[in-house]
UniProtKB/Swiss-Prot annotation:
Protein name (database record): ATP synthase subunit c
Keywords: ATP synthesis, Cell inner membrane, Cell membrane, CF(0), Hydrogen ion transport, Ion transport, Lipid-binding, Membrane, Transmembrane, Transmembrane helix, Transport
Gene name of the encoded protein: atpE
A GO molecular function held by the record: lipid binding
UniProt keyword Transport, yes or no: yes
Superkingdom to which the source organism belongs: Bacteria
TM region(s), chain numbering: 9-29, 52-72
């Protein structure tokens, strides 16, 4: 296998981390909407935790993107 093909395969595998992050963000917001629907008084508290969870989950996707780009262009 030549080096260019290995770089492409590695970048593709690193990008798989973004799929999991997308699923996680969807689950966070779906559960937040369901929780506020059941208990509207808890909206401010639940919304804060939702944004924190979103930020942490999205950071994982950004790390996966950075690794994929490093594998493509710097390795």
């Amino acid at each position: 296998m030549d080096a260019e093909a290995a770089k492409m395969i590695g970048a593709g595998l690193a990008a798989i981390g973004m799929i999991g992050s997308g699923i996680g963000v969807g689950n966070i917001w779906a559960n937040l909407i369901a929780t506020v629907g059941r208990n509207p008084a808890a909206k401010s508290t639940v919304e804060l935790y939702g944004w924190i969870g979103f930020a942490v989950t999205e950071a994982i996707a950004l790390f996966a993107l950075v690794v994929a780009l490093i594998l493509l262009f710097a390795a």
